[in-house]
Amino acid sequence: MLGEWILVDTEDEMVAIFLQQRTYFMQQQKLLSLIRQAIEDYNMIEEGDKIAVGVSGGKDSLALLHAMKILNRFYPKKFELYAITCNVGFEGMDFTGVRKFCESINVPYEQVDTEIAKIVFEDNKDERPCSLCAKLRKGAMYKRLGELGINKIAYAHNKDDFIETALMSLIYEGRFYAFPPVTYLPEVGVTVIRPMMYAPEKGVDNFVINQGIKVVKNTCPVDGSTKREYAKQLMEQINRDNPGTKDRIMHAVVNGRFEDWPEVHRN
């Protein structure tokens, strides 16, 4: 890790370690830069905010939590940072690693235990369970955030997620749209922010690998077979055939002037 003393036997080993640590540092700075740009473009953080990162245990949410912890040390607007997980009750899901990770970076952690899995897959038997699961999961977290006095939740949707959402919107809804960077939910008094909107998935992957962050295996029975996964694979194929398509779609999303998107605040 960066900043640790490492004994080496040869000059070649020393050079290799230096290059590895330099790459690690550059990737960390790149991700932090993209997150900060999004935060400032859409005024996501205000002085005195209490922000919880929604942590699923996956690479994106853990990367965002770690990056937000680093940002918390030097960002000019002071904010309190928390982490929250909704345990929907899938068999085999274990968030012990998430709790330990939060303890290691000194972030208060809250786990909300529910029976959402039973409701979605046994009681409801909906052929499209993802939207119901997401709605119930968010509702459970928002309720707990209100009890804790936390006013914002940060979701780890990255650049690829925004692009895939726009593609799904075209395919399944007949419109061009993506979720907004900032959304205030008056019924629960919580503001949703998405600070990783400019960060490509590959960059997040590299950050997680270099930080040595251990992710939690997703035991959802429909993981990997959803409409979003279909859109992801389709987008990858389109981008291979037409390099640069992802960037052009993201440009269109950011400049789409969607009704519920806030204005960009750039100097």
Regions found by a protein language model. Name each.
Residues 9-12:
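Intrinsic-disorder-associated, low-complexity terminal segments enriched in Asp/Asn/His/Tyr and depleted
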Residues 160-240:
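Catalytic subdomain that performs nucleotidyl-dependent activation
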Residues 244-267:
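A short, charged, Gly/Pro-tolerant segment at domain boundaries
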Residues 22-166, 172-175, 202-210:
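ATP-dependent adenylation/nucleotidyltransferase module used to activate substrates
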